[in-house]
Each structure stands twice: as C-alpha cells, then as structure tokens.
Amino acid sequence: MNSYFEQGGFYGAHGVHQGGGGGDQYRGFPLGLTYAQPHALHQPRPQDSPYDASVAAACKLYAGEQQYAKADCSKAGGEQQNGYGGKEAWGSGLGALVRPAACTPEARYSESSSPGRALPWGNQCALPGAAASAQPVQHQPTNHTFYPWMAIAGANGLRRRGRQTYTRYQTLELEKEFHTNHYLTRRRRIEMAHALCLTERQIKIWFQNRRMKLKKEIQAIKELNEQEKQAQAQKAAAAAAAAAAAAQGHPEH
C-alpha cells in the first residue's frame, strides 16, 4: 500500500519499470492517473519467445537493405538524367530487396496477435511488388525503327520506283525533239541518251508519257469543241423559237 505514495512509485516509475517485469510496472503506476509516456507500450514482454527476437532482427535487416537500395536509386537518378542508368540502378535495387521469411503476410498476421507490438515494416514489405508493377509503365520502350517493307509498295507488293526528275535543259531538248518526231528510232534514241546523259529507257518512257499527254490534250480540245457546238446549237434553237413565237403573236394582214 505504501508503494503508491512513494516517490519512486509515482514520479520515478519509469526508472523502475524499465528494469523490472510486468508486475512491477503495474505496481508502480497509480490507477487513478493516466500515464503520459506512450513508448512504454512498446517495451518487450517477458513471455516473448526467441523466435520473436529473430523475426525483429530479420525485419530490421530488411529495412536496412531497403534504405540502402533507396539511396542507390537516388544517387543513380542524380548522376544520369537520360533514364537508362536510372533503370539499371532501379533493377539492381529491386534485386537487393529480397523479402525475408519473417516479412511474409502469414508471419505479419501471426505477429499482430500481440497487441503491444508495433510493425513499422508492414508497408515496406509490400514495396517491391508495387515498384515492379509500376516499372513497365515508366520505362515503356518506344518503337521508332524503320524497316524497308514499310515503304510505299507498288504492284504485286514490289517497292515502287522513285519518280525521275529532268532538268530544264533536258526537258527543253526532249520537247524540241518531240515537236519534230513523235516516235524515235533506236539510233536517234541512243544519240539523245548520250547527249542528255540519260538512259534509253528513260528516253523511251518520256516519249510514251508525252504522247499520252498529247492524246489527252487533243481529247480535251475535242470535248471543248463539242461543248461549243452544242452551246451554239442551243442558242440557235432558242433564237428560232423566239422568232416563231414573235411571228405567231403578230400575224401578217
């Protein structure tokens, strides 16, 4: 009874219950007052088994490895800004985060049965999985490779040839020759190919295209002439109809 009023039992209870057991802690604490030191709840209990000590040591080691891995990641991110070095450092950091057996969910639930123990590593045990799931989102490779089959294909899946461009001098000489002859002989084609630094095939294709262009021009001129004739015929018919109407409206006496 006298222990409740002693100085060591009222104000000096902290020094007493640290060295003693659970009974001394309760005996040195007044029932009518609230204790103002919450860290006393985290004191090890006397009935803890050696397995609890090994679990705490393993989780402490795991937390230390996580801090070391985070330091490596921050260091690599500061040195290299292009992203590839950070990715390698991130992978090496994940390799170091090997989850011990004590940090499994089963061990966490079994250890949480004691209400007086705190588990500060509960969130850290779930870090590697979340980081691994977020890694492919942050480092998605961009596919900008160009392959030959991506070019514009021609007939039968073959690659289309580029369009030949002619200089003004070459075009002028070809137009002058086409104005004289629409069809070239083999000898004349060879002479023009040597004179204009072109191949016989290019000369032949140019003349074919030029003849087709001339044919379209002639066809367009014919269509214009036909439209002109039709327009003149309609005008003549309209004029004749107007004259006939005028003649019917004013008969001759």
UniProtKB/Swiss-Prot annotation:
Tissue-by-tissue expression? In the embryo (at 20% embryogenesis), expression is highest in the first abdominal segment (A1) with significant but diminishing levels in more posterior thoracic segments (T1 and T3).
**DNA-binding region, residue intervals:** 159-218
Keywords tagged on the record: Activator, Developmental protein, DNA-binding, Homeobox, Nucleus, Repressor, Transcription, Transcription regulation
Provide a GO biological process annotation. Answer: negative regulation of transcription by RNA polymerase II
Give the primary localization class.
Answer: nucleus
Where the record places motif QA is 232-247
Pfam families annotated for this entry?
Homeodomain (PF00046)
One Gene Ontology cellular component term attached to this UniProt record is: nucleus
Which PROSITE patterns does this chain map to?
ANTENNAPEDIA (PS00032), HOMEOBOX_1 (PS00027), HOMEOBOX_2 (PS50071)
Task: Report the residue ranges where the short sequence motif Antp-type hexapeptide is annotated in this entry.
Answer: 146-151
Look up the domain of life of the source.
Eukaryota
- Cystine crosslinks: none
Q: Does the keyword Repressor apply?
A: yes
Q: What SUPFAM superfamilies is this protein classified in?
A: Homeodomain-like (SSF46689)
- Write out the GO MF terms: DNA-binding transcription factor activity; DNA-binding transcription factor activity, RNA polymerase II-specific; RNA polymerase II cis-regulatory region sequence-specific DNA binding
What the entry lists under InterPro entries is as follows: Antp_homeobox, HD, HD_metazoa, Homeobox_Antennapedia_CS, Homeobox_CS, Homeodomain-like_sf
Q: Where in the cell is it found?
A: Nucleus
Does the record carry Glycosyltransferase as a key word? no
- Give the family per the record: Belongs to the Antp homeobox family.
What exactly does this protein do? Sequence-specific transcription factor which is part of a developmental regulatory system that provides cells with specific positional identities on the anterior-posterior axis. Binds the consensus region 5'-TTAAT[GT][GA]-3'. This homeotic protein controls development of the cells in the posterior thoracic and first abdominal segments.
Print the domain comment field: The QA motif is able to mediate transcriptional repression.
* Protein's name according to its UniProt entry: Homeotic protein ultrabithorax
Q: To which species is this protein native?
A: Junonia coenia (Peacock butterfly)
According to the entry, what is the taxonomic lineage of the organism?
A: Eukaryota, Metazoa, Ecdysozoa, Arthropoda, Hexapoda
**Gene encoding the protein:** Ubx
